[in-house]
Amino acid sequence: RNEFIAYGELESNKIDFTPGGAPLICYWQVPRDEAVTIRVTPPNAAYWAVEFGSYWWETMDYRYRLCSLNMHHAELEQDGSLLVVVSHEDPGLPNWLDPSGHDEGYVTFRWIGADDYPRPQVEQFPVSQLEERLPENAKRMSREERVEQLRQRRLGVVKRFGT
């Protein structure tokens, strides 16, 4: 739990390895009073994405909730690193993954056509310690910015699926 493993290292998943890529998966459990941070510096890549789902491998409601990131809408920190927070309440950070009422599930990082395949580092702690665990200059997001972020995501779904 809370450690990323490459798909190719899983005995049962040898056939699922992505040609030209290196997917990594992590099982998470986040009680309501805890948070998880995931940190990594993304490699130079043709594409990278973070996918988030329930224990049952269901995708979350990506039309109305923040349950995925990719190189186009993730906000990197000033040092080029990616800071992702998983918590049941909005932490006011741009790269929040919303568990959507679930207490456990999976998160997958996909590095496609990358020059390196870094493993994200995971920390879990009481949500009351979140502020002290963040970098001093961590990017923030206001309530208004979150509303706009969600609106833009919905527009993206409409453009893709026409619904």
Regions found by a protein language model. Give the residues of each.
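A compositional/structural signature for long, glycine/proline-rich flexible linkers
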Residues: 1-163
